[in-house]
């Protein structure tokens, strides 16, 4: 976003936000601030779909579903007004685990794109599964030879540009560039 603004580029970025219904209020506030501050250069896909989400908080279920219509009385908060729901996605079905991968292909086709790159903001320091995503030895399908990319579908790739950032890198960048951030991290620091 900073690069687009500094170089006065005439491009828009699609932002895919999987709204999980149950999130910290500070996280929701941060997402809303970022969307509002950048609406001139981003197209927002705020998705409120009852996709399967793995959980270890139940002895009876291996997954839960945010925004499940049949459990609307139990929703933690109202659905955002600008949300896209399951009716917006012809590929959605209740059995799928790979919603975000299918979304990438859907947006590629919808935009009639030549190539699509989805930027994913994960850091390998945060979890072993994230580390495996980048360093898996059997990683055959990358964009050119960039190890921090993965092919999702024909001409659709995920890229992980901050995969090697450490926690200190994140805070150094925030301090240097005065980026907005989720103030929930201030509470974690205390």
Predicted regions and their residues:
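Nucleotide-activated chemistry modules centered on ATP-dependent adenylation/adenylyltransferase
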Residues: 1-190
